[in-house]
Amino acid sequence: MKKIVLATAIFFSGIFFTNAQNATPLKKQFIFSAIKGTVSKPDSVTLPPATITARFFSGDTSSFKILSYKKLKLILVFTPSPDFIGITKAKLQVRTSSGNTILKLIGLSTKGLEGENEPTLATVADALGYKINIGWTTLANHILPELQGDEIPYSLFHKAGKGKVEIIPVARYSPDFELPFGYYIDSAEKPEMHQVGVLAKTNEYPEHQCLFPAIASGGNSFDPGNHIFGFYATGPTHTAYSEDVWNMLFYPANAVRATRIYPLKDSTGKLINNNYLLCYEEAKNGDFNDYVFVLKNITPVTTDLFTSLFNGKNLDGWHTFLKDIGKNADPDTNFIVQDNTLHVVGKDLGYAITEKEYSNFHFKIDFKWGERRWGSRTKEKRDAGVCYNIPMNEPDSIWPRSIECQIQEGDVGDFWLLGFSIIKVKGVQNQPDNHTRMQKYTDGEKPTGEWNTVEIISYNGKCVQIVNGIVVNVGEEASVKSGRLLMQSEYAEVYYRNVKIRKL
């Protein structure tokens, strides 16, 4: 049992007891991190003037050390052994004239720097004393938008109450660089970013691979006023946003889901109101331990940012067009609305098209193939599509000038440039023609018969097409930048649902 005597005499004066009673409450918990066989960054506590002794009395006392004690300031470090990896704990008892106080000591020991040496996000949360279901226990996971564990589906926030919002860095396991971080609000052209602080590079200690990384400049709080806001962090190659849409649009080669946000819970699992854990993914392996912040005094925006374009009851807000039949004429009942779904039988060639036009938007739609095929599609791949940015003055035809997100078995996400429209994909522009194909560069489809989600972002001439959370095609400098949208009927039975749009 380790013991350090801090005072050998006690003076029972009235002044002494007043000072002791009014002293700042002791910090009760100390959390350290270090690579195995090394010494952590120190932490300290100022003990009450009435302190008599401080001693380690339970747990893994060999992994913690009292570095020094001067003028009531006690400095502690974590010293894991060269063969220990994981979390260890001990307790330090501070004895004063008015009683005893127990200080809890927690240490996280890791294998080494970066890569497979890093702790899992679940381990990080455990070391920090947060009983959160992260959703996975391995190091790597994935960057798809499916919610994991206790993750919330919201990425924008309000300030919850008076005072400032706090954004406190509590963990970082990333490559070594300075990291600006902060919040953003909506503006006319793009997110308006407000830097709060900058995480430090490695110095005497590996600040990029530790708990409670140092801030090189700035602070850890801000006041957004009444604005709705999201969070961002900027690494050497890209900025990661709390909203997927900006990651898809600005940095489609990186993680689409760049943050996972969890309600903060204490060590017993009790919810800490208006507090959240913000976890960033810097690369694409899905570990989400790159930069981790505790957020305080915030509440999520829970209203849906999307507007439904299809009411599930009828085609109000749309009109239909069928080849050789015309507008709003459907003698063979090609379009059937039932169970909040648009069932396109597909016997006729045509579409349902919006009456309104849209610019700078994020569009979503679910589709599923049916069984039947007709005409030229009897022995071919099932085919359909979503066309967008159709000019208001463009007459109904097969097919109007637009950009098409191909929905065809095996090819979902291809660009088709219709009516001599053009776009550049990876720096190469299509040849203008009645219809030109620009193939997707990766695949995200589910097997025929399952529901798929297709997303389209059109923003100032840049078009991003996403299939089941995977960016499959990106085009720039499109010749058509705004307009109407349509859902095709192209000789294959298909079902559409959850048709909605968000103005950006």
Q: Model segments located where?
A:
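Feature for long, exposed domains in two main contexts
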Residues: 21-115
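Bacterial Sec-dependent N-terminal signal peptides
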Residues: 1-23
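Carbohydrate-interacting regions of secretory-pathway proteins
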Residues: 302-504
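Propeptides and adjacent flexible N-terminal/non-core segments of secreted
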Residues: 76-79, 95-100, 108-268
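Short beta-strand-plus-loop segments that form exposed binding edges in beta-rich domains
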Residues: 233-236, 280-285
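Low-complexity, Pro/Thr/Ser/Gly/Ala-rich linker/spacer regions in secreted
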Residues: 110-117, 298-308
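A recurrent domain-boundary module in secreted/ectodomain proteins
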Residues: 283-302, 499
